[in-house]
Design a protein with these regions (language model features):
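Short, glycine/acidic-enriched loop or turn micro-motifs at the edges of active sites
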Residues: 10-12, 61, 125, 251
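The start of beta-strands in P-loop NTPase/AAA+ ATPase cores
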Residues: 2-4, 53-54, 117, 243
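Common nucleic-acid-contacting/processivity interface regions adjacent to the catalytic cores
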Residues: 14, 153-254
């Protein structure tokens, strides 16, 4: 199953808010770069009957809104459970705080040996940085470019060389960075899941210390799980600081 990074560029005019270009770059084969100038062709590409792709958008919450708009305007139905899948349906994984994690679109489901679908994830849940910073921090040989984002592009706009180079670098940067992550076996949907999987692999007593709770108990406390975050102050970045301290304090989050 091949994996690609993907990106949309859109008009900023509220009265003509649409995708004027899309781009894809294969992870592990960055010479395979694909682009077009409308969302219809993007969806047609995704619906390849011979292959089910996995895509990564950087900030799926933004691009996903355009995907939803197209699907709902073209006869697709959202379903809550994959067991309900049928032709032209899709599922979503979105948190109660509006965080987008995944979209799965089912194009054809009648063949029991091959369900024609595309799975879309948010690479920002793996690398929570801007594309520009990712290129810098990974020491990539390419960098993010610039275009005039406010310029109006009409329907059918033919991309200039500058625009092609811009969107190509965006998806290629992400493809190169994700390839590095995947080679390090960091393949989960989120970096938090990768961290937990790594911790479980080194703590053989994990299941004894943190047993799976009965459903009723979990349901009672589930709403208290809102997580937290790990942050590195820039003044300490890439510096030896000596011994540190660990604080476990309640009620400091959020």
């Amino acid at each position: 199953m091949r994996k690609f990074t993907a990106d949309f560029e859109t008009n900023v005019d509220e009265l003509d808010c649409r995708v004027w270009t899309y781009a894809l770059c294969e992870i592990g084969n960055t010479d395979n770069f694909i682009y077009g100038n409308n969302i219809e062709d993007f969806i047609k590409w995704c619906a390849n009957k011979k292959e089910n792709y996995v895509l990564y958008f950087h900030n799926l919450k933004f691009d996903g809104e355009y995907i939803f708009s197209y699907l709902l305007s073209n006869g697709y139905k959202v379903i809550k459970d994959k067991k309900q899948r049928e032709d032209k349906t899709f599922t979503t994984l979105i948190s109660d705080m509006g965080q987008f994690y995944s979209i799965e679109i089912y194009f054809e489901t009648k063949n029991p040996k091959h369900v024609n679908k595309v799975t879309i994830y948010d690479s920002q849940k793996i690398l929570n940085m801007t594309v520009e910073k990712i290129a810098e921090d990974f020491n990539l040989p390419i960098k993010k470019l610039e275009i005039d984002y406010k310029e109006y592009r009409e329907i059918g706009h033919i991309l200039t060389e500058q625009e092609v180079n811009y969107i190509r670098n965006d998806v290629e940067i992400m493809a190169r960075a994700l390839e590095i992550m995947f080679k390090e076996n960091l393949t989960k949907m989120t970096i938090g899941s990768d961290a937990l999987a790594s911790y479980k692999s080194i703590n053989k007593n994990f299941n004894r210390y943190f047993p799976v709770l009965p459903y009723e108990i979990d349901k009672d406390i589930r709403q208290s799980y809102k997580g937290g975050f790990t942050y590195l102050n820039d003044i300490y970045k890439e510096k030896e600081t000596g011994g540190g301290i660990v604080l476990d304090v309640n009620s400091l989050y959020p």
